[in-house]
Amino acid sequence: MMTVELNLAVNREAVAERATRLGEPSWMVAKRQDALDLAPTLALPKVEKIKIEGWNFTEGTTELETVTGLSSDIEALIGENRDHMLVTRNGQLVHAQNSEASNGVIFTTLEDALKQHPELVEKYFMTEGVQVNEDRLAALNAALRNGGTFLYVPKGVKLSVPMQAIYTLEQSGAALYHHAIIVADVDSELTYIENFVSYGDEAHSVNVVTEVFVEDNAKVLFGGVDTLSKGAITYMNRRGVVKQGAKLEWALGHMNDGHTVTETKTHLVGNDSFSDTKAVTVGRGEQKQNFNVRTDHFGKGSEGFILIHGVQKDAATSIFNGTSMIHHGASKSNGVQTERVLMLSEKARGDANPILLIDEDDVMAGHAASVGRVDELQLYYLMSRGLSRKEAERLVVHGFLQPVVSELAIDSVKERLVQVIEGKVN
């Protein structure tokens, strides 16, 4: 077993001291320490065709500066309706409102949940979802966590309005380790929308692990729009565990400006379970991004769909890996995926790799992929109608992404994405 030296400013004692100061239970303190010991023995996430070994995933202080209140940027982002809203700045809670508390809904920071509902957190924290030993960055998230969210909807409760969260990092040279747990108990329904935001070109790192549990016959709509700045090195690991007859829909906008590694994986463990992953991205500048989207079929009659469209500008590079794995025993399952990449310049690079892995008979599966440069004839036609090249490219980009954006199940995510896409294209 190879061990690497990590440039961390903390050790076992410091991790335990911080956890104890926060009032965490002994099992969580031990989990933090064990994860810290494990991290140097683990490899970075496996990434195709992009070298991430030199990326600054671990340097940066985990002691985040205290900020209070809602900044003008956050005010503009959340608007007037704040009844079901949680906001953290530098990992610290600055606003929380849960109008569904009377129905038993828990919507709070992970730290508060550890104090008030430790048994629930222990049940779901890195047990069935993301594993501590998956890779080095997952282990570091478990060890160094300095932000997080816990959302739990009880059995039979069906929420009619989205629960929303905004997480900002506003400190250069800082490292945010955020961990979210989203649980829809049996026969419940919820919509959860999150936005990760950071500012400035100064170096900082963001490590996010999100675990979504959809119990029997429950339904979750998960929306995420990430707009981390050019200085952010980002690792984002989102995992869904979907039980019998349950449904999970991902609606994701990967709109960071810095180097990014994302993993969105769904485990369809129950019979007749369902997942649908839709994502769009716009890369620009010299950023490098790697997107791994995977659906694992374990339950009979499970259905999984993946649809990703990406646009690359300037000298940006993005790799899209889509995998549908139908395991032995998952008969009558259906796995379908499509990845499409459009490049707007000679220096832009994109790659789409659809993969089908099938270990069962009596199943359906299909994939499609395309990578290509913008059609100059199409641009010429638009420009002949009086548009500038920039305006023509803008229309082409919106048209290319529209088949995904229009199908997103959450209207507010659609609206937010259109705004962000417009900003990145211009």
Roles of regions detected by a PLM:
Residues I106, H117, E122-L387, L401, ...:
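Conserved beta-strand/loop scaffold segments within soluble protein domains that form the structured core
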Residues M1-V209, D216-K219:
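Short, low-to-moderate order helix/coil transition modules at the start of elongated helical scaffolds
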